């Protein structure tokens, strides 16, 4: 941007490991969430290049020449020290440096961020999510772990039996979810952040078999949002998912969860909630 160039992030629409193994690899950030994050950061373009057989077999030199320097017209390329690309991942930062003068771009290799001498990586973040340690995961990510999606109809247990409506999301199978349980959350609806309590799991107290779902009680929101795209940010772990002896016992526990969440926000007045607009007025992406 300082040099007057538009900014672009190059990534693949399908993770290379998924394409090569034939098995879905879960991701911390889905394509839709990544688009929203890039827009929030002010990135001009997000290139989601298809990872197909042609690109898998492309020699790394051709990848640099034909795609990065050719189709994208890159003039400043920024990579990490362990980047890899091209057939069998043979391309690296050294190759990019070697081709720099020939193709007329300038290479920037940035060092990895570390946390107490450990590289911050997706593996490290997944480990913390599996523990339910979203506060640590958020610190590693540099932003709250979030789940985006359209609000769908659930079983109406929240509104008809427990007395308070909830917003249900069905996360895609590729989304890496944290430990099942209840979390303090912040929910973005129509550019406004609200306080929330989010349960992730299979609703063990309710009879029947339910897929893994994300169900959120939203404070201070009293209107129909079915079909709306919302963003649920997890801020702190409350308790693990558990099966209660009755719906009445579950209702009592949820009231305690709401009190826990309210107390969390009281202790963190710096967190934007309850009607304050996000800077820039960003709308959640469809």
Summary of predicted features, one role per range:
Residues 48, 109-111, 234:
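Structural signal for conserved beta-strand scaffold positions within catalytic alpha/beta enzyme cores
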Residues 154-278, 282-286:
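Phosphate/ribose-recognition catalytic cores of enzymes acting on nucleotide-derived substrates
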């Amino acid at each position: 941007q300082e040099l007057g160039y538009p900014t672009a992030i190059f990534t693949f629409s399908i993770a290379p490991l998924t394409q090569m193994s034939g098995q879905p690899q879960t991701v911390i950030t889905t394509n839709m969430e990544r688009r929203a994050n890039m827009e929030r950061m002010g990135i001009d373009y997000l290139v989601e290049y298809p990872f197909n057989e042609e690109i898998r077999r492309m020699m790394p030199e051709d990848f640099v020449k034909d795609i990065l320097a050719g189709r994208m017209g890159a003039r400043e390329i920024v990579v990490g020290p362990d980047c890899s690309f091209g057939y069998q991942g043979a391309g690296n930062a050294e190759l990019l440096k070697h081709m720099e003068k020939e193709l007329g771009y300038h290479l920037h290799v940035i060092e990895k961020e570390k946390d107490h001498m450990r590289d911050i990586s997706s593996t490290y973040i997944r480990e913390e999510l599996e523990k339910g340690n979203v506060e640590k995961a958020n610190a590693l990510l540099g932003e709250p772990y979030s789940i985006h999606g359209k609000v769908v109809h659930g079983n109406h247990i929240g509104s008809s039996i427990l007395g308070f409506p909830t917003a249900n999301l069905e996360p895609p199978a590729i989304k890496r979810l944290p430990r099942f349980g209840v979390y303090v959350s912040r929910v973005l609806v129509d550019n406004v952040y609200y306080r929330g309590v989010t349960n992730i799991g299979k609703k063990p107290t309710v009879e029947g078999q339910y897929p893994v779902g994300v169900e959120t009680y939203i404070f201070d929101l009293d209107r129909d949002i079915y079909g709306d795209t919302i963003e649920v940010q997890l801020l702190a772990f409350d308790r693990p998912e558990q099966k209660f002896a009755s719906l009445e016992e579950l209702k009592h526990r949820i009231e305690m969860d709401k009190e826990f969440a309210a107390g969390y926000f009281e202790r963190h007045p710096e967190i934007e909630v309850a009607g304050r607009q996000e800077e820039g007025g960003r709308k959640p992406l469809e």
